[in-house]
Design a protein with these regions (language model features):
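Expand to "…catalyze enediolate/carbanion chemistry for C-C bond making/breaking, isomerization
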Residues: 2-5, 12-13, 17-19, 24-241
Length: 241
């Protein structure tokens, strides 16, 4: 399992920016009625904008994904959905099935299930991001959520059809020190799951040596930029505007 150990202060500036985005919407006030609905929409809009900036400036800007730019250019090719409930705590039990999901399944997993089913049944979007700005701030908790999402793909019999890529503000490879710039290849403004179609991935980048070399090339790129530059790039995407 990836190491969730964190040193105080390393990612505080990213956390501060996320807090500004969330508090600026008024969501924390738990206002009733139209005010709460407006706050939730504001949160969703801010998170979607920050996520898109991250794709444009970091993922595409640093060349981390060979076909991300083309996806951005095509209408309806990318879906960015935001889970704004903050209810990320329960799990899917081993006895669950696709037709009989757990009654206590949390909102984020329900949203992930819905997105996965839509991608299995419809040609659009080509790829999708589920962003969870509240409830998965702890990296180890996020890894548990990722495992539950993988389990759901199995329950839905979508293993081999869809695959997941994982991104988190505090992402850390288990073999890397916390200040290794390589960690930024999988760091994002908010915790998120990237849902990809396996057929699309193979068509775009293949399954041979080029595909296998992408992670190593990304690590080399991040390390050549350095920790401070990578942190600044990520921070600029999550600043409240």
């Amino acid at each position: 399992m990836l190491d969730a150990l964190q040193e105080p202060g390393i990612m505080n500036d990213l956390s501060d920016n996320r807090d500004k985005q969330l508090s600026a919407t008024g969501l924390d006030a738990r206002c009733p009625g139209d005010t709460a609905a407006h706050a939730a929409k504001s949160l969703t809009d801010n998170v979607q904008r920050a996520t898109r900036r991250w794709i444009e400036q970091v993922v595409v800007g640093f060349g981390f994904c060979p076909y991300a730019a083309a996806v951005l250019e095509r209408e309806n090719a990318l879906a960015i959905e935001v889970c704004d409930s903050g209810e990320v705590c329960d799990s899917v039990s081993p006895g669950d099935s696709a037709d009989n999901p757990a009654g206590d399944e949390d909102v984020a997993l329900q949203q992930f299930r819905s997105m996965a089913r839509q991608m299995a049944e419809c040609p659009d979007p080509e790829t999708a991001l589920l962003v969870v700005p509240q409830g998965l701030e702890n990296f180890e908790h996020y890894l548990d959520f990722l495992a539950e999402a993988e389990h759901l793909l199995q329950l839905e019999q979508l293993t081999g059809v869809l695959q997941l890529a994982s991104f988190h503000p505090d992402y850390r490879f288990d073999s890397s020190p916390i200040d290794d710039p390589a960690n930024f290849t999988n760091r994002s403004p908010f915790p998120m799951l990237h849902i990809l179609r396996e057929e699309s991935v193979e068509r775009q980048i293949g399954s041979g040596e080029f595909a296998a070399s992408i992670p190593e090339r990304n690590i080399e790129t991040a390390r050549s930029k350095g920790f401070d530059a990578m942190l600044a790039a990520l921070r600029s995407c999550s600043e409240f505007q």
